[in-house]
Amino acid sequence: MNWSELKNSIPNDGFAQKYEVYRRARPTVTLVILRTVTDPILFRSSDPERAETQEFNGIIHAQVNGEKFVSKERLTGLNLCRELDENENIISKEYTYNEPINSLPKSQTADMLTYGLAGTVSGATFSQKSRVIEGYTYGLEPYDLMNKEAHNALYESGTMRDESGGQSESFFHPVKVQPGTHFVHFVTLEAGTKEMLLYVIHNILGTGRYGARETRTGRDMKNEIVGLITYSADSSLRCGEL
């Protein structure tokens, strides 16, 4: 299937006719995503050793800010842009995630137009609001705060004592979200185009590492798109409504 056939296979409902900075119409497409934990994940909060929590019917569940997912997925998208780029037609070599550059034209990438950006040019600030709306999500299974791991920092001796015999105090006890935990997450594209939806879907399905220390632990989550809702107005949902 080529690019045109792929776009034509998507229903027209829920999309803007074209990209516009001013959103005179706000149709939406909401993706229903099932995120399944496949390896223990640490989602840090104000407590660096555990996730936020929410209690439903007397049972504690892990609560995760949607930005913790989307921030990783944006990196997947930027990698795609760089793979497809020739002569900086898609993305400037200076563009990096979360580090605005002093040039509005060089900041205009698929990442910026879809997920938004704020920066400064010649002393004046500019911002592009995100077309992607992501809310909190909660683990469907209980979150056991007593299931703690024990980690320490070893010296080159392979023990917790340095050359002088001093004892290291680098102990920490993370409470990770365990394999088999499921998150139902709603991600909404507002006043977006079909190209933006395909970009967002690629980023979701192409990302499998989330949470703290993911560069050392590998893939820890599987994402599946299990539903899609389109509407001429706001179709966004919140997991707390389930």
Listing of model-derived features with the role each one plays in the protein:
Residues 1-242:
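RNA-binding basic/glycine-rich loop and surface signature characteristic of RAMP-family CRISPR effectors
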